[in-house]
Structures are given as C-alpha cells and as structure tokens.
C-alpha cells in the first residue's frame, strides 16, 4: 500500500493544475516535500535483582568473583561475575557508589520497593510514589497497544517493603506484575477475543458504566469534607485512567496483534517453570525483547527476585541452580570465602542471562529500514537496591 511521502507520491513544487488553456500553479502541499525521516522510538527497560552482589577487595582470595571490574573508565577488566558482558562492553557502563538519598535511612532488607521511585517510605507510612518507568509509560501512552509490560518472577504486588513489582502508578500504588509466560504471550501476541463485535460491545458497556460512575462520584464529592474530597479526587483520577485505557482499547480493537516468525516462536518456552531458573528467566527476557521488537510497548520492567524471604519463587533460584543457599542466605555470606564464590556464581548466572538479552537486542534492527538496532534505541537499567548486607 502506498503511503503519502513515499517516492511514488511526491509532487514537484513546479507542478501545475492544467485545464483548457489554463495553467494554475499549485500551492505548497505536504506531498511536495520529501518524506521527513521518522525518528526511531526510544524504549526503556529496567531489570532488578535483590540482596546485593559479591564485593571482594583486590587482596581477597576470591577477588576474581568480585562484581565490580578492575580499573576505571574504558580501561577495565571484567571479573568472573560480569565476564559474560565482555562482548557488550562498548554498550555497558558499570556504576557504583550510587544510592537514593531518601532511601538511605531504610533498612537494607526494605529497599526493593524504591528501585525506580527513590521514595522515603518511612515518612509516608510505607506509601510509595510513581516509578520512573510509569512516567515514561505516560509519555508514550497511546503510541503502542500497551503502555508498559510489568513482569516479575513472583508476580502480583507483594507487600510494602517486600514488593513483587517494580512499577507504581501516579498515586504510588503497585501495579501487579505478570509472571506466567503463557499469560504474557497471550496478552501481547495471542489472537484475543475471536468475536470482535462482542469485545466492542463489552468496551462500549464499560465506557457507559464509567460515565455513570463519574457522574455519581461528582455529585458525592460536593457533599464531602476536604480530606474526603482529596480521596474522591484520587478515585476519580483512577477512573479517568480506566476511561483512557478503554478508549485506547477501542482504537486498537481492529488492528491485528503482531505476528511472530517460526524462529521467534521456537525460542519461546511458554511452559517454562520458575523451578527451572535458566529456562524461566530466559523466556521472560525473550518476551521483553519481542514486546520491543513488535513495538507492542516501549516500557518494560522485570523483577528477577524480590526482597521477600526464602519462600519466594525467585529466592529459591540459587538452590535450584545448585549454587548453594537460598538467595537471602547467600547474600549474608558474601564476606566468607565459600559464600563469596557462591554469590559470585549467582552474579554470573544473572550476567549470562542479561548478556543473551543484550545479544537479541543488538541483533534486531530498530525498524524495517533502520541502520540502528533495538539496543541502540533502548535505555536499560540493570541493577539492585543495595550493595551488601
């Protein structure tokens, strides 16, 4: 299908409308100009893991398992922990000594909720603020089918200081994370409701219901005190956000979801279970890559494990990998010889998975006619909420 702006639909500025004995110069039209280059969309990804990394001094007998590279600037050498990132050293910047000023007073076990918010939970009765990924999601709202992709190994929201999501809406409320690969795939790439007319009626019904809710809430607000008015305003704002989502869903309902190649499908292991960490984490990364590749969303977060105790799904990963203790216990042994190596091996596992994701992003063009790659157009934050316990 031809598009305005393509070479086959450009007019020279000297073109004329010609009639019988008449030649009328055309006014400047958009189609006369050459097609302006379309800027490749930017993307944001945030990947988080808890409980610190293996910190080893140069004189330590386990120095090779120290997380931070040797040297500074561009002249550095990866230790065993981050060696899998060697192929991407030109695209990777390793930063240390950073912290959220407002989070320094919070206990090390309680800082996972603040990775993307930097919020002082203690002074706000454990009520968070909006996460940076959701600020970006609002910026891109409507440009993609989904504003963001929020994932975690444990799924849901968890509880304050033990959150199982990285993402918080504009009111500081946690956004439930998805953790079932098949569920994520169906939402982003599945056929959806086979009866489009029924789906359209459902969306229309939802819109009508929201109109009634807004009307009733507006009447109620006028009879409330100042504090309750603030609460109802917050509620109304939430309803408006739902309205916007319904409106966007109506706009996208007749647009087919992106198709995937056989090779893309073969890489996915949608039956991957969190009891097999290597397959599970790889699949979550692959889903993130596909979401970016198809421009289904431009914002994604993945919490590999939470700050919860040893019973969490992600917390069991080291044991399932045969590295040693559960993640919490592993972190507490960081300053012991055996513990330093075990924690370093966990760090390396994470780096291997991350490196594979970077490979996929680097080998995928940012667009059909683009010389850039997805990695070129994506800011990726990969890190944790504390150095050591």
Where on the chain are the PLM-derived regions?
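Ligand-binding pockets and gating/stacking loops
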Residues: 1-387
């Amino acid at each position: 299908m031809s598009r305005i702006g393509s070479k086959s639909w450009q007019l020279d500025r000297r073109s004329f409308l010609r009639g019988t004995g008449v030649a009328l110069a055309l006014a400047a039209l958009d189609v006369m100009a050459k097609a302006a280059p379309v800027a490749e969309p930017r993307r944001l990804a945030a990947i988080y893991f808890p409980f610190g990394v293996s910190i080893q001094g140069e004189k330590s007998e386990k120095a090779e398992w120290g997380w931070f590279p040797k040297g500074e600037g561009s002249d550095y050498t990866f230790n065993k922990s981050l060696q899998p990132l060697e192929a991407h050293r030109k695209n990777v910047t390793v930063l240390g000594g950073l912290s959220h000023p407002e989070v320094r007073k919070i206990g090390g076990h309680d800082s996972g909720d603040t990775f993307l918010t930097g919020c002082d939970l203690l002074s706000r009765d454990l009520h968070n603020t909006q996460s940076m990924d959701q600020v970006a999601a609002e910026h891109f709202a409507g440009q993609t089918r989904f504003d963001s992709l929020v994932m975690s190994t444990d799924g849901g929201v968890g509880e304050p200081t033990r959150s199982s999501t990285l993402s918080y809406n504009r009111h500081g409320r946690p956004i439930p994370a998805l953790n079932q690969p098949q569920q994520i795939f169906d939402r982003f790439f599945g056929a959806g409701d086979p009866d489009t007319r029924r789906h359209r009626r459902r969306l229309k019904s939802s819109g009508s219901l929201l109109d009634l809710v807004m009307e009733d809430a507006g009447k109620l607000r006028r009879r409330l005190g100042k504090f309750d008015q603030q609460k109802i305003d917050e509620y109304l704002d939430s309803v408006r956000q739902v309205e916007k989502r319904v409106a966007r869903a109506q706009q996208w309902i007749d647009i087919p979801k992106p198709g995937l190649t056989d090779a893309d499908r073969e890489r996915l292991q949608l039956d991957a279970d969190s009891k097999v960490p290597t397959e599970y984490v790889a699949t979550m990364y692959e889903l993130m890559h596909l979401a970016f590749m198809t421009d289904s969303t431009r914002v994604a977060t993945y919490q590999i494990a939470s700050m919860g105790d040893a019973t969490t799904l992600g917390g069991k990963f080291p044991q399932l990998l045969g590295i040693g203790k559960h993640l919490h216990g592993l972190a507490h042994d960081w300053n012991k010889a055996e513990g330093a190596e075990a924690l370093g091996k966990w760090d390396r596992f994470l780096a291997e998975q991350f490196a594979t994701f970077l490979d996929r992003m680097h080998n995928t063009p940012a667009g059909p006619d683009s010389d850039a790659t997805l990695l070129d157009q994506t800011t990726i934050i990969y890190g944790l909420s504390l150095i050591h316990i």
